[in-house]
Amino acid sequence: MTRSEKVEIIAKLEEGFKASEAIVVCNYRGLSTKKLEELRNNARENNVKVQIVKNTLANIALNNSGKTGLVLKDTNIYLWGEDQLSVSKVAAKFEENNDKFEIKTAYIEGEVADVAKVKALAKMPSRNELLAMLLQVWNAPITNFTIGLNALKNKKESE
């Protein structure tokens, strides 16, 4: 890889890392190409970026984007995106289904996060799911009132 290619990769990563709310670093050693393609497709559907890159290049991009403190060892695959939940869910779900895939560390909300935080975020409902729950709670009293009125109407009609 030439120096200009490395500079280009660093610039591209730096731009992505600056705009991201979450970066998850995972071990992918032993995964087949088919499984990696499955991860990329799933990530693409959820607006999550995935890239395998040398640790030195990733470290430079992370430092340039102001996200320091991640300890990078061995071979890593990086997942990042603007939505913390999407990134966490993609990584955690893929780890559940693949023994050879392992979440190592993450950078979430401006700080280094451990695996437990990534998995906890992955279990949280998405914004749309939360809105649906909220609407259900708001509609419950009206629904119960309507059911009560219909029951009263049916009782009056039967008398």
UniProtKB/Swiss-Prot annotation:
GO biological process, one term: translation
Protein's UniProt keywords contain Ribonucleoprotein: yes
GO MF annotation: an example: structural constituent of ribosome
Keyword RNA-binding tagged: yes
InterPro entries associated with the record: Ribosomal_uL10, Ribosomal_uL10-like_sf, Ribosomal_uL10_bac, Ribosomal_uL10_bac_type, Ribosomal_uL10_CS_bac
GO cellular component term of the entry, any: large ribosomal subunit
Family membership noted in the UniProt record: Belongs to the universal ribosomal protein uL10 family.
Role, per record: Forms part of the ribosomal stalk, playing a central role in the interaction of the ribosome with GTP-bound translation factors.
Subunit text: Part of the ribosomal stalk of the 50S ribosomal subunit. The N-terminus interacts with L11 and the large rRNA to form the base of the stalk. The C-terminus forms an elongated spine to which L12 dimers bind in a sequential fashion forming a multimeric L10(L12)X complex.
The protein's name in its UniProt record: Large ribosomal subunit protein uL10
Gene encoding the protein: rplJ
